[in-house]
């Protein structure tokens, strides 16, 4: 969102990720849906863990939406559950990005080591969810 993905992409390779995608036009929920669909799993995202740029939530609460919002909801909405999450945060999770961060799926046993290595390189990361058995995406 505020830095290029090259350093993070290079750092994660040594940890043998299960999946990596850049969060761009489909927004976080759309790309999580793609990851879940193509991998035959479910993705559970923690709403409280999502990084949000300063001022973005306030704009979403005021009803500001991008043109991609309805298209992303149409693309992934049938497979995405957002019950109990504010509409403003849901809108941000569907918001298309031109240069979003990476959505990385790592086996739990390697996640903490990657977090340490990324931190040592000065990379921002947030653990925002888990992969589970099932299908679809749940933002809770």
Label for each model-derived stretch:
Residues 1-12:
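Active-site glycine-rich loop that binds ribose-phosphate moieties when present
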